[in-house]
Every structure is written in C-alpha cells, then in structure tokens.
Amino acid sequence: MSEKHPGPLVVEGKLSDAERMKLESNYLRGTIAEDLNDGLTGGFKGDNFLLIRFHGMYQQDDRDIRAERAAQKLEPRHAMLLRCRLPGGVITTTQWQAIDKFAADNTIYGSIRLTNRQTFQFHGILKKNVKPVHQMLHSVGLDALATANDMNRNVLCTSNPYESQLHAEAYEWAKKISEHLLPRTRAYAEIWLDQEKVATTDEEPILGATYLPRKFKTTVVIPPQNDIDLHANDMNFVAIAENGKLVGFNLLVGGGLSIEHGNKKTYARTASEFGYLPLEHTLAVAEAVVTTQRDWGNRTDRKNAKTKYTLERVGVDTFKEEVERRAGIKFEPIRPYEFTGRGDRIGWVKGIDNNWHLTLFIENGRILDYPGRPLKTGLLEIAKIHQGEFRITANQNLIIASVPESQKAKIEKLARDHGLMNAVSAQRENSMACVSFPTCPLAMAEAERFLPSFTDKVEAILEKHGIPDEHIVMRVTGCPNGCGRAMLAEIGLVGKAPGRYNLHLGGNRIGTRIPRMYQENITEPDILASLDQLIGRWAKEREAGEGFGDFTVRAGIIRPVLDPARDFWDNLNCRMASV
C-alpha cells in the first residue's frame, strides 16, 4: 500500500441504498415494463426512477412551471432526458435524419442537444414516447445503453479531422472499448425492443451484479489536442503514434471534476499517469481498471465513490499494481506527449486524405430553429445531400466530415443560408455551459441560458482592455456536479443559488490544472467587476503567449491546486495580490 495514502482496499460499512436498488433490480429490469403502462403518472415510481438511468434516461420536469403546476394541484410535468451511446461522436447522416424527425415530432422542446460527452440528448420525452425512442434508435443502429448511472459512459475520442488514418484507428479503439465494457444484461432488449426473455441466468463478468460503485468515464485522446478534457475522466488512453500510425497508449487514471458544496471530502482531481501499453493489451487493461474500481470503490458513500477517491485512499501505486496483476502486464514508462490546445478549429480544414471537414460552432450545443437562424433545418438539409458523416465534438460543436471538393461549395451555401456559419469571437468559441435550468433537477443557477449574454459582457471587457481577439477558456456549470467542466477552465463558474456562483480561477488553456475558488456565492455584477480588474492586469502585465489562467497563477492572484485531496479547499476567497 502506498506510504503517502495508506488506506483500506475495501470500505466497510452499511451499503448505500443505491447498492440495494441495483441488487434487487434483477439485472436492471426492476418493474420498468409494468411502470410504462401506468397512465396515472407521467413519471416512473420507486426504484424505477433511478433504474431508467442505466437505460440512458433521466426523469426531469420543467422547473419553470413547477410552482404553477403545484398551485394547480398537478404533479410536475414529468418528461425524460435520453442520451444516446455514440462512441467518438460519429453519426451517419441517415441516423441524423431519424433523430431530427423524432425531436420534431415527439419531444416537448423540439431540439437536439449536443453534449460535451460527444453525443446528443433529447429533452422532453413524455412517458408514452419512451419506448418508441428506443425503438427508433435501434432501427438506425443506435442505442442509449450505459450512457448514465454506474457504468462506463459514452467513450470519447478526439475529433481529429486532419490525420484521418490516426483518427480512424483511435476511433476504432474507442468503439472496441465501449463494446467491451457494456453490460451483458438483456434487460434493455427485453424492455425496449420487445425481445424474447431467455430462460438463462444473467451474468455480468466485468461489471458485476451490482455494477460499478459510481459513474465511470473513458476517453481516447490524440495529442496535441486535449479537446476531450482527459482530466475530467476516470480512464484515459493517450494515443502514441509512430510515422502517423497508432502503436499504443499512455494510460492515465483517476480524473474527475464533481464536488459537493461545502463537503471537503469531495474535490476535483486530475488523472494520474500509470504508464505506456502496446495496442494488444488495451482491452485487458481497460477491463482491469474497471474491475479494480468495481471491487475497491466505496459503496457506502456515493459522494466518495468515484475512481479518483479510490486512488487517493489506496494509493496510486497500489491501484496501478493491481491493474497490472489483473491485466497480466507491466506498464512501460510513459512515452512523451504534449497538449497545445483543446478548442475546436471552426471552419474548413483539409485532411491528409484530401477530403474537407467543416466544423460548425453550435453555441451551447443546442440545435433548434431560431428566428433568422434555422440551425436544425440547415443540418437536416445538409444531412440529405452529404455522403460522409457528422462528428459531434466534446466542445458541443458539429463537424461535417469527409466532404469531397465537388460538394464543398454546396454544403457551405446551405450552412451559410441557415445561420450555421457566422463570424464568432474566439472568446465565444472557447466558452461552454451545461444545460441546467429549466430541465435539470440538480440545477442551482442558470448555465446554458446565462452564458450567451454573459459572454457578451466578457467580450466587452476584452475590447475595453485592447485585446478583443484574445480568449479565456470559460465554463459555466449550474451545480457542483461539474457537467460543464468548469473545474478545468481558466474562468469557472459553479452555480450556488439562483443568480449566484462560485468563481474559480487558475486553470490553464490546455486543461491540465484544476482552478481554485477565488470568490464564493457572488452575483454576475460582482463576477464582472473582478474579471474587469483581472483582465485589465492580464492585458498589461502578461508575458508573450501567456494565457489568463497561467497569468493569475504567476502573478500570485490565485494559488494553484497542487494536491487536490489536501489543498483543493484551502484558503477560500484567498487573494494573494491586490487587484
């Protein structure tokens, strides 16, 4: 056991109620099938409320009208969020046309939401349309299995449109990892696809009868781009190439961003380097990491159940050695790799295969027909003629991939005619928010609806200080769960209450440093006042090429988080230099 962090391999104590629920669920069936036929409520009852998450759904309601409905003695307007499993974010144009139609015909909001998990979500699916959405996805070769709850979630892969061969190889591994770590229960097929029940006992050789202690996230990343924010994830395979061909991966384990306000047992953490592995060991190593976390993760306290906490409790070396034992390998030393950025390159780029790729900026990932900007219709029209594929990025944007020279002008005209290609500032391109209100039940403050106007104000500050073409990686998340990845931003806003946020500073542009809380529970005017002063200093005092986050650390404005298990919460509201 590590001398630095000695602790038990298994946490003893009363199991959380989620563990009971999983054990009693009959491999994730529960009584979901019966609940579907209950027309007295628009939601799912009892354990089914949580069990549907294993099937890719969350039960939500419209919080904008919750109080109004309560006054009318009505239950909340329940509706489901469904998240598709889409390893690497690649979707065919045929599949896109199907999801476009479903969103228009069968959801309350009529939108498609691209997420920073490199997939799409439907919001506002009424109970009567839950089974049809799964059947629609199946009809075009998609599913929503294991995109939520205590499983390996959608596997991310760098959206690299330039080096087509390397991207293709990395993407294939993302798919293989996703398939290898899927649950084996037939519950999904039986409930949603009406497949016949088989008179055999379900087995889960990798995930186990009670699945994982907590959600688990995996990435495949191609340096020098860190577009998938590897340090937000439990398990990361960093592609190592020789002469443009993939030869193996560096493995990093134990990243994660979610915290709980005021709970100092929770913290954001960057992933730890384990070592290098040749390609042929990839699936064995992935399985070994997952099963080690399955067996050693904390099942008594879900707030302390993620892989990052397991590593801190047992020690990185102990966890790594167990992975080696289970996989039957010894990691080689980490091979050199470097990240230089994580934003998407908006506009056209030409790949080495001579095909063109058009990256479209989709603010907050929300695809809808807005007045004067019919984005959803535009993408549908492109999907009808495009013979390549679409790629959803981890920055909530969309790539029209593999466009031949002969189609380039036609696709660009469609994009421009529908408001999909507009001049966008570097600051807006590098700003992102989670959904939050009105649909997320965990939301404490606005995020998606807040960010566009807030970005306008930050742009005005940059203009005021003579640096309008600069950018700061900025993220807003409506609660401390961290879906907006604010804990890897240069400016991170974390919702605390309606209209109030914690302001975190000191991350960097490449996403390898956790920002520290600078001010707590403050309003938008307070945030903007602080940013005005700090950005003014950055504009005058920065070194050549120095990003805002690096400047705040170098200038002593914020102390960097060096060892989050011990110093993430240190010196709240600390201002080490006058601003």
Swiss-Prot record:
EC number of the protein: 1.8.1.2
Binding site for siroheme: C483
SUPFAM superfamilies in the cross-refs: Nitrite and sulphite reductase 4Fe-4S domain-like, Nitrite/Sulfite reductase N-terminal domain-like
InterPro entries cross-referenced by the UniProt entry: CysI, NiRdtase/SiRdtase_haem-b_fer, Nit/Sulf_reduc_fer-like_dom_sf, NO2/SO3_Rdtase_4Fe4S_dom, NO2/SO3_Rdtase_4Fe4S_prot, NO2/SO3_Rdtase_4Fe4S_sf, NO2/SO3_Rdtase_FeS/sirohaem_BS
Cofactor annotation comment: Binds 1 siroheme per subunit. Binds 1 [4Fe-4S] cluster per subunit.
Record flagged with keyword Isomerase: no
Cofactor dependence: siroheme; [4Fe-4S] cluster
Biological or metabolic pathway of the protein: Sulfur metabolism; hydrogen sulfide biosynthesis; hydrogen sulfide from sulfite (NADPH route): step 1/1
Domain of life: Bacteria
One Pfam entry name: NIR_SIR
Enzyme class: oxidoreductase
Binding site for [4Fe-4S] cluster: C434, C440, C479, C483
Any single GO CC term annotated in Swiss-Prot or TrEMBL for this entry: sulfite reductase complex (NADPH)
Keywords linked to the UniProt accession: 4Fe-4S, Amino-acid biosynthesis, Cysteine biosynthesis, Heme, Iron, Iron-sulfur, Metal-binding, NADP, Oxidoreductase
One biological process term in Gene Ontology: cysteine biosynthetic process
GO molecular function, one term: sulfite reductase (ferredoxin) activity
Catalysed reaction, written as an equation: hydrogen sulfide + 3 NADP(+) + 3 H2O = sulfite + 3 NADPH + 4 H(+)
Self-association and partners: Alpha(8)-beta(8). The alpha component is a flavoprotein, the beta component is a hemoprotein.
Membership in a protein family: Belongs to the nitrite and sulfite reductase 4Fe-4S domain family.
Its job: Component of the sulfite reductase complex that catalyzes the 6-electron reduction of sulfite to sulfide. This is one of several activities required for the biosynthesis of L-cysteine from sulfate.
Record protein name field: Sulfite reductase [NADPH] hemoprotein beta-component
Organism: Salmonella choleraesuis (strain SC-B67)
